[in-house]
Amino acid sequence: MKSLESGLVRLFQLRIQNIVAKLKEGDKAPDFTVRDGEGQTVRLKDLRGKKVVLYFYPKDDTPGCTKEACSFRDSFAKFKQRGIEVLGVSFDSEAKHKKFAQKFDLPFRLLADTDRSIAESFGTYGEKKFMGRTYMGIHRMTFLIDEKGKIKKIFNQVKPEEHAEEVLAAFDE
């Protein structure tokens, strides 16, 4: 079972390699206004002067997405120490985000991109293929945004359990 799971994960990762985000490192990050799981308005422009991790994930409370969120949770003190704001983005509603954050004690904000506008502007929404099925969805990607609002790094391939430490290392480069 584990080798089947590993094979499926690798197949999915290979598919991700073929995604070309329309944004590049060094580009200005697109601004957005959206609500988080607590119903609070979040504007990217209001975070200028801070480093931001904007991580896109497919769905709350699913195995890979939970591992990734818990990875950020477990490393959150390190992000906070460095003054880095962590924001998760999916198509889930504010209510689902609130429930997910409470269930796993997530200390960062989850953004409800219910109209897909953020994912589309960052190039993370598109065709996906998994287990012989083709569908449209959000690709697991992460953007590191510097204090001036520029994209410092884009992660097109993400290992959910290790991702937070990988992101921290990239900010330290």
Regions found by a protein language model. Name each.
Residues 4-173:
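Chalcogenol-based redox active-site neighborhoods
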